[in-house]
Structure formats: structure tokens, C-alpha cells
Amino acid sequence: MSELRFFTSTTEVQANHILDLLSLEFGEEDYAIATTEVDEKRDIWETSIYLMFDEEDDILARVNAALVTEFPDLPVEREVIPDIDWIAKSLEGLTPVRAGRFLVHGSHDRDKVRPHDLAIEIDAGQAFGTGHHGTTAGCLEMIDSVVRARRPRNALDLGTGSGVLAIAVRKLVNVPVLATDIDPIAVRVAKENGTRNGVPNGIEWRTAPGFHSTAFGEFGPFDLIIANILARPLMKMAPQLVTHLAPGGSVILSGILASQRWKVIAAYNGAGVKHVRTIWRNGWVTIHLQ
């Protein structure tokens, strides 16, 4: 089914405020909401929400209701998104990525693997996480560092996407890993990636929204929890996430802009874990707490 977006065109300050209003309206639901700079000189920004055609009337009404008080005369525009696999298209020709001892590469770059690399083969596809984004690469580097310092007895990869982080843990240490994602397609792709990378066993792949699954009680508590999601849901889930952490365990968080770092750290300090280290990559941060 094709996708479309509703969007507004405003200044940067207004765009950020609209983003907050739409996030309040749709924050608990699975809609992508984003701001994009269109014209730097004229300070024109677009704030967009992406949806499917069959949701059009309901979502437009909710967008208008969310904005009417503070932006009563602001037009909400509509655009159909071309039916193109943008993930695969944008990642064509990407070179291998090194992060710690890991080398993440596509199947076309197998010849780039060195004898001592911990190689992970991930092709562009339907799930996030090929190592090229600063958040994924930062997590891989932090996993290498944390596991070197203290071998975990088990691990949780929350929001596994392509499965690259769960696969990385298994390549470092032979311990059980629970990998979950809200998207069943991502879970299927991740499981296939695990088999392709020589770890068909030892990773339990589960479809689970947030912590709403019996799997967390079944396999936890965890010595290592990794969550590469986004700052807002990470902050919201802080108390619940920490309840699944074993005493002395480590938390690795990413999907966080550098400007959001202290807010996330504060949320997790309040939940009982303290900041250990931060890695910066391309405007994104990966945080280790314990």
C-alpha cells in the first residue's frame, strides 16, 4: 500500500513547536514525525507526518485539531510518497563500516573482511541497522568496549531492527541474547541475518511492543541491555527498562541526538543507573550507564 505525508511549511522555531504538538497527539502510536530544513536562507522548514492512504481522513482531522489553537490559519499540505524502496536505494554502494573490532559490510564487500575482523554481513533491506548510521556504529563500538571490560551472562537487544547488535553480542561472547522488535517483518529479517552470520542459535527473536511480552520475565534480568531507538521513548521507558537490569548490569542507549544527551542521562539517573561513558558519531550519541 502506498504512503503519503501531511506537512506544514514554517520557520524553524514554529516547526519545532509543531513537532512537539504532533508528538503529543501521536506519541503513543507508530507514526513517523519529522522536521526538515527546506531553505536555509529563508528559514523555511517542513514538519511532516507519514501515513498510509487508508488512514488519510482520520489523521488529517487529528493533525488539524492538534494545531488549530496555536496555528489556526496554517495550511496542512498533502504529498504522495513514491513507491520506492528508499532504504535499499540510499544504501547502494555504501562501503564497509568499522566500529571497534566489528566490520559491518554488505554481501558485495565480503572481500574487504580481514582475518581478525568480527565481520557482520547486513544487506540493505526492510529493517533498520546496517552500521552506516551513527547510532548503530556507536552501539557497536560501545558493545565492544563494555563486553571487553565485563563479560555479561545474558543480553537484551530492545528494538533489534536488522539484528546487527544482537549478532554483534553473540559474535563476542557465547551467551543467550533476547532480541525484540515491534515490527514482525524486522524480526523475520533479523532472524535471517542471524543465520547468515553464523549465529542461528543463542538468539531468541521475539515480536514485542516495548516491554509487553512474557519473554522479558522469562529470559531476564539482563546483564546487558541495548536500546537503539529514539530519545523520547527511551526516556519514557527508563523506569521499566531498569527493572529488567541485573544488579551491576550495563545499559547502552542510542538513537539520541547530542542535544538530547543530558535529558536522557537525567531520566536514567532518576531510574537508578549512572552515566559511565558517551561516544559521539555524526551528531548522534551512544551512552553507557551502569
UniProtKB/Swiss-Prot annotation:
**Major location, coarse class?**
cytoplasm
Sorted alphabetically, the keyword list is: Cytoplasm, Methyltransferase, S-adenosyl-L-methionine, Transferase
Entry's EC annotation:
2.1.1.-
UniProt GO MF annotations: protein-lysine N-methyltransferase activity
Q: Which compartments is it annotated to reside in?
A: Cytoplasm
Q: What does this protein do?
A: Methylates ribosomal protein L11.
Q: Which PANTHER family match?
A: ELECTRON TRANSFER FLAVOPROTEIN BETA SUBUNIT LYSINE METHYLTRANSFERASE
NCBIfam families the UniProt entry points to: PRK00517.2-1
- Protein name as it appears in the record: Ribosomal protein L11 methyltransferase
Give the source lineage, highest ranks first. Answer: Bacteria, Pseudomonadati, Pseudomonadota, Alphaproteobacteria, Hyphomicrobiales
